[in-house]
Amino acid sequence: MSLTFSVSSLHPLYNYKPISTTTLPPKPRFLSIKSSLDDETQKQTSWVSPDWLTSLTRSLSLGRNDDSGIPIASAKLEDVSDLLGGALFLPLFKWMNDYGPIYRLAAGPRNFVIVSDPAIAKHVLKNYGIKYAKGLVAEVSEFLFGSGFAIAEGPLWTARRRAVVPSLHRKYLSVIVERVFCKCAERLVEKLQADALNGNAVNMEEKFSQLTLDVIGLSVFNYNFDSLTTDSPVIDAVYTALKEAEARSTDLLPYWKIDALCKIIPRQIKAAKAVMVIRQTVEELIEKCKKIVEIEGEKINEEEYVNDNDPSILRFLLASREEVSSVQLRDDLLSMLVAGHETTGSVLTWTLYLLSKDSSALMKAQEEVDRVLQGRPPTYDDIKDLKYLTRCINESLRLYPHPPVLIRRAQVADVLPGNYKVNAGQDIMISVYNIHHSSKRSLLSAVNLET
């Protein structure tokens, strides 16, 4: 079977235009890979500001009396084009090798401090909510997530997390694996059979995105999007919204904050329609479930509560009788729908891509699955016995973490480990990819899966 993998950065703020990688079957069972990540002819395009604006931003934001101790990356237009229109982690990694574990990058109208040092990353993340906030991520994504916990800050984030987490208990996971995960995976396998027999190329990123949307629809809402077999307007709407969020992070001016302009600019009209599709879908599912819960008079009477007919998270939250507005509930569930299905799809795509490049690892993973499952569908309890496959997934996450960068904004002036100074309002990119790939760190290698 031939597989076409999309191996772009897959970041929530990534400009979604897949880079394809095709695998051809040199012999039965195993796959060989030719990666287009190294193909210089397949660069994606994105609008970026000219070099003079980047230089001006660098001069104005830093001045001559910069005492931060942070080196400044000298990025040209072609470098910034790669950064904003291509795989985000690649140029950041290049500059880490040139300038070290922390450097400043002026990209058009913005400047970022890029962090690739674990101690500095820990400092920033540990002080989230005290000295640091989500900043830019929240600004460019609010139109989509509203007040959902994906971008919520402070007490609101704490309250919403406490409300949602209890629904993800062991009994729920066991039921969902059996009733949702397995059935959706079997449906994907059935759909791939014809392509396998005919030797057709398949975009597996697309298939995994459809698969995870179906899984999230059933496990969160008890709703079958059936995107594996039918065209789903929700998927198109999700990617349109994510693409808009990515574009907003690179706009010269945040004109999208002006309502009048959003009503006449085609890009904003398209984004607004996409968000409307997503929100209407979620709102309809909430109202439908609310009516059922009220009719049945359902209340949670045990810690690990699961409704036999509808084991979804939505059913749990409504049955808990928590005092929460419909809008807040919608935004929380929308966070799961949009962010959840894409992150999971990314892990599946990268893991399959890497296994397909290593026939011995693929064989060992297949042998473990055959030995543990003995031809039956998997259960939640089987996970602990699928040790090698779990290590393969973990290694995939190390090599291609999702997201590859985390963005935070300093709320107050701060001194980072190493005596680097940042001002209030400074946007910081923590490059998880760089940390995982730094030659100076003691990290497991891809060849060390045996241990």
What are the residue ranges of the model-derived segments?
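Hydrophobic mid-domain F-helix/FG-region of cytochrome P450s
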Residues: 109-122, 146, 186, 202-227, ...
